[in-house]
């Protein structure tokens, strides 16, 4: 289990009523990721999704379908199929040090079996307490909560809200 630093980390836990492979597929298939990665009604576009350690994770978003603006430019640090993804935006997809806005972070997504489907856990780590506080104030729980709900609905066989 990951050690949580409450001064610097934000967490979100859900049970998704779908098997782990369905949740994993929604994370690792570009056409599926685009359906839930940003809160509706914003639209996501997956520009690069190289699901391997060191692989690029690049997305854009649009409020009205055009133009798209950069959203995520990060790299995968850890990929354990059907169990764990870790990515950071502190290094961009070209492996250059980055100063992402609004905050630099490392996100760990963990999928475990649960009697009702998948135990889904997000841990987002920040460099210091101020960055954590800023991310929370900007709506971490609302934003990540909304996309997790959309992910769950997709993995459970529904459609995006």
Pin down the residues of each PLM region.
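Hydrophobic ligand-binding cavity/cleft-lining segments
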Residues: 1-44
């Amino acid at each position: 289990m990951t050690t949580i630093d409450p001064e610097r980390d934000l967490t979100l836990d859900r049970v998704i009523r779908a098997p782990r492979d369905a949740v994993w597929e929604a994370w690792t298939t570009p056409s599926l990721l685009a359906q839930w990665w940003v809160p509706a009604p914003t639209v996501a576009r997956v520009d690069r999704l190289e699901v391997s350690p060191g692989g690029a994770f690049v997305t854009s978003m649009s409020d009205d379908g055009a133009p798209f603006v950069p959203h995520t430019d990060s790299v995968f640090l850890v990929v354990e199929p059907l169990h764990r993804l870790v990515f950071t935006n502190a290094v961009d997809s070209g492996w250059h040090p980055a100063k992402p806005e609004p905050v630099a972070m490392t996100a760990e997504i963990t999928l475990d079996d649960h009697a009702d489907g998948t135990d889904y856990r997000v841990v987002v780590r920040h460099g210091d307490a101020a960055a954590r506080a800023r991310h929370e104030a900007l709506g971490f729980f609302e934003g990540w909560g909304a996309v997790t709900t959309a992910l769950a609905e997709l993995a459970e066989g529904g459609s995006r809200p």
